[in-house]
């Protein structure tokens, strides 16, 4: 029986003034250990999801933690039978998760971390405003019971949503969550800057909650979107049954795949009537290349349009 692939989502907000110089040695550490996936580097820290054998992930984590600034880098693990990534990349960015608000710095101020074991009690408090900081297509397939959906298409829209809908003088307690902890951590820094006083966020995100909270005690409803080819995971961290539309990135279920508007790699019921003819032709050509690569047992020549958590 083949060894399962370990998928590690990791991040840390920490000042990395030499992040440009870190790119090449980090990429070498990944390739030397057979690690695939994408890591983002910025002055504010590191973020991304990678996958490899147990030995490969352990070797990469050891390499990262050899740097005193990354010795406590946060990471969550899950497993799958096949490699969920096709390439190995290290990208340089202005932000490791893009909020687009100058001055927001989680290295200087963040909300209160809440461990998964204490999360249920917090969000069961009727005075706590519970906000899902993820994008609309993620929220659509699963969220915590009673959570507010901002209906944002990107994290950049989150600040405008907060300004339009909430008042620090009226909303005294705010709790936020996201997939792995990074977006809600940065959101908490933003909220404090806007004058909100009691700001909480789920430490380690939904994935750590799944890992540490028993399913029979869970307040989660649905699957959780992940940023790799598994698309979603269940509460037990096993791979879900969703696919993802390559055109619009929206998760698609069995009902979507049975729709007359679904064409593998080209369109789905969520986007079929919004695609230009040029985009449709490009998607058809891309799908042909992907199917040809699969038939030859080769990595996809173009790959899926997956991005690091954004």
UniProtKB/Swiss-Prot annotation:
Please list the reactions this protein catalyses. Answer: uridine(34) in tRNA + AH2 + O2 = 5-hydroxyuridine(34) in tRNA + A + H2O
Can you cite a GO biological process for this protein? tRNA modification
Molecular function GO terms recorded: oxidoreductase activity, acting on paired donors, with incorporation or reduction of molecular oxygen
What cystine pairs are annotated?
none
Is tRNA processing found in the keyword set? yes
Primary role: Catalyzes oxygen-dependent 5-hydroxyuridine (ho5U) modification at position 34 in tRNAs.
Family (UniProt)? Belongs to the TrhO family.
Mind telling me what this protein is named?
A: tRNA uridine(34) hydroxylase
Q: Which organism is it from?
A: Pseudomonas entomophila (strain L48)
The upper taxonomy is: Bacteria, Pseudomonadati, Pseudomonadota, Gammaproteobacteria, Pseudomonadales
């Amino acid at each position: 029986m083949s060894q399962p692939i370990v998928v590690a989502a990791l991040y840390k907000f920490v000042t990395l003034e030499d992040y440009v110089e870190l790119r090449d040695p980090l990429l070498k550490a990944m390739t030397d250990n057979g690690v695939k996936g994408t890591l983002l580097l910025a002055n504010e820290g590191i973020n991304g999801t990678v996958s490899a054998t147990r030995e490969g992930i352990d070797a990469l984590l050891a390499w990262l933690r050899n740097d005193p600034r990354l010795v406590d880098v946060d990471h969550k693990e899950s497993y799958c039978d096949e490699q969920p990534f096709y390439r190995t990349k290290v990208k340089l960015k202005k932000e490791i998760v893009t909020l687009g608000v100058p001055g927001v710095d989680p290295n200087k101020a963040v909300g209160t971390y809440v461990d998964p074991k204490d999360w249920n009690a917090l969000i069961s408090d009727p005075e706590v405003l519970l906000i899902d900081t993820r994008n609309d297509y993620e929220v659509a397939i699963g969220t915590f019971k009673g959570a507010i959906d901002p209906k944002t298409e990107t994290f950049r829209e989150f600040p405008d949503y907060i300004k339009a809908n909430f008042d620090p003088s009226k909303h005294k307690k705010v709790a936020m969550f996201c997939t792995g902890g990074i977006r809600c951590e940065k959101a908490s820094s933003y909220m404090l800057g806007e004058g909100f006083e009691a700001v909480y966020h789920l430490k380690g995100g939904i994935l750590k909650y799944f890992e540490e909270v028993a399913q029979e005690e869970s307040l989660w409803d649905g699957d959780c979107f992940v940023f790799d080819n598994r698309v979603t995971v269940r509460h037990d961290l096993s791979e879900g049954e969703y696919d993802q539309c390559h055109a619009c990135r929206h998760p698609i279920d069995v009902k979507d795949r049975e729709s007359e508007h679904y064409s593998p790699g080209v369109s789905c019921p969520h986007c079929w009537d919004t695609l230009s003819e040029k985009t449709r032709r490009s998607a058809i050509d891309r799908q042909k290349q992907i199917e040809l690569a699969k038939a030859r047992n080769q990595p996809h020549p173009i790959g899926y349009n997956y991005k690091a958590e954004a």
